[in-house]
């Protein structure tokens, strides 16, 4: 079994990560990714997402409300409907109330118009547990701290 895992890493995972690096994704070592996620129960690179939300949504998202936006993203259920909701966040279709304008405004999570404004990370051996079940992805891609 050890050969199979070693072979999979050598023939699939490593080449995929290497290619991602070649096209501009920054590699994050597994141990560093675990710290950025705040442990195996974390789904996001919290600090990265926090910084990008504030940067991409000037005046709408601030240090005062960024945690609430992240809580909303983290609260999305792991279902087909939840996947659609996360896609809505990625596409900028989810909104929050803008007190200064007295209206809902869409939140930008990914800047599609200017890709250089985004942060692209790739990591491997992403193990996640919710306390009852554990799941592991060989390779994980994140844009602005959010797994895609």
Regions picked out by a protein language model, each given a short descriptive name:
Residues 1-148:
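An alpha-helical interface "stripe"
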């Amino acid at each position: 079994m050890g050969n199979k895992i070693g072979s999979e890493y050598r023939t699939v995972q490593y080449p995929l990560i290497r290619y991602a690096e070649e096209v501009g994704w920054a590699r994050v070592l597994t141990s560093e990714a675990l710290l950025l996620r705040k442990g195996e129960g974390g789904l996001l690179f919290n600090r990265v997402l926090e910084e990008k939300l504030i940067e991409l949504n000037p005046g709408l998202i601030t240090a005062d409300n960024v945690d609430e936006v992240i809580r909303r993203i983290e609260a999305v259920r792991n279902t087909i409907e939840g996947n659609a909701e996360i896609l809505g966040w990625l596409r900028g279709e989810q909104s929050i109330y803008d007190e200064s304008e007295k209206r809902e405004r869409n939140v930008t999570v990914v800047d599609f118009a200017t890709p250089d404004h985004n942060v692209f990370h790739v990591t491997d051996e992403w193990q996640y547990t919710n306390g009852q079940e554990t799941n592991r992805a060989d390779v994980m891609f994140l844009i602005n701290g959010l797994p895609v």
